[in-house]
Amino acid sequence: MTENSYKTPCGCIHYFVNIIDKQKITLVFLPGLTADHRLFEKQIEYFEKKQNVLVWDAPSHALSRPFTNNYSLSDMAEWLYEIIAKEEIYNPIIIGQSMGGYLAQMYMELYPDKIKGFISIDSAPLQKSYMTAVEIWLLERAEPLYKIYPWKVLLRAGSRGCAETDYGQNLMRKMMMSYDSDPEEYARLAGFGYRMLAEAIKADLPYHISCPALLICGEKDKAGSAKSYNKKWHQREGLPIKWIKNAGHNSNTDQPDE
């Protein structure tokens, strides 16, 4: 994998890419909020010699810092599109975990004919019709909750809440430790991410799935209403769904072989 970067007005995005054949499918991996490229290390290890792959550290995360938290989900989708164009990727399948899945939906909203497939991992629909007013209100006010908890408590809750296996929990803890020198940065990032998500939902855009799609969700996903959303998404849109046994919110780390 080669590390590359892309400059934006808010900061520099770092990503890793390995292109074998530009005409073939490229797997584009998008980690969730507060996670980074390491979330997909098992998938990259498996696919990098077989498929074109790209994975990024999202803006304001890990290597993509410092970064000014003054952008929207549509800005992120535009930057992702520009990175994909820069790397001459013509046939992307976008695989988004949690917030990465929301970003993939925004990308489809802006560039419906520039995507070949979408895989949602423990994410949920961006359409406003799925959300209650209370849920949106809570998203906008998450930051103070993160600031209340001592960092050690957050570390424990974050790793155990996202994963069921030792590997998954240790990996989440490792990614969270990127913010160990400034836990308030972690709280600001989480709060900003949830507010950005709320704004995208309130925009009430169609967020039509414009390509073949697959929903993946851990049977033990405890993050918000992820399981409930995925059931409704599957029922309303007719999207195929795969439930992962013994897996939490980061199901791809709990059961990578599935």
What is the predicted function of each stretch?
Residues G96-G100, A104:
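Gly/Ala-rich beta-loop-alpha elbow adjacent to hydrolase catalytic centers
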Residues L54-I95:
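Active-site loop/oxyanion-hole signature of alpha/beta-hydrolase fold enzymes
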Residues K42, M106-L110:
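Active-site signature of alpha/beta-hydrolase-fold catalytic machinery across serine-
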Residues S210-A247, T253:
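Conserved loop-alpha-helix segment in the C-terminal half of the alpha/beta-hydrolase fold
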Residues H14-P66:
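Conserved HGGG/HGGXW glycine-rich cap/lid loop of the alpha/beta-hydrolase fold
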Residues E109, K116-I148:
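Flexible "cap/lid" loop of the alpha/beta hydrolase fold
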Residues M1-C12:
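N-terminal cap/lid segment of alpha/beta-hydrolase-fold proteins
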Residues S129-M131, I148-H208:
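Conserved alpha/beta-hydrolase catalytic His-Asp/Glu region
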